[in-house]
């Protein structure tokens, strides 16, 4: 029998090698799926933050329109003060005055209604505070439960100390 330099040469892959490669590939796919899920949560959080900024500007513009509708300084101050609250408004106010109607529209748009989806989040709350009433400088704040990025755990936030996101816009009317 003649001597062969390579009596047995393996060809192809063994079943064990194929199974290990499939396992590594599956773990990689699970990692990609997790990464995509986190990316979608971050994109949703970004959308909510943008909507909250637009919403804060909306109430400040409504205040500006109401205040500028009169030339009487006393009436201007009274109108502006009607928007102000130190507490978070998490439900729509009732009433027939222009400030209450504006606040109702603002809260309803942020939280959504039975016929309209929420602009920000169903847990959204808002408030307007006076920074300097003499110069008509006010701050509009929007607070909501942002599970992807809420980091404000102050006991005075709209969720009573649970992690929340608060967007704040200050403007002079």
What are these regions (language model features)?
Residues 2-57:
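Aliphatic-rich helix starts adjacent to a transmembrane/signal segment
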Residues 41-46, 50-173:
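Flexible, low-complexity segments enriched in proline/glycine/serine and punctuated by aromatic residues
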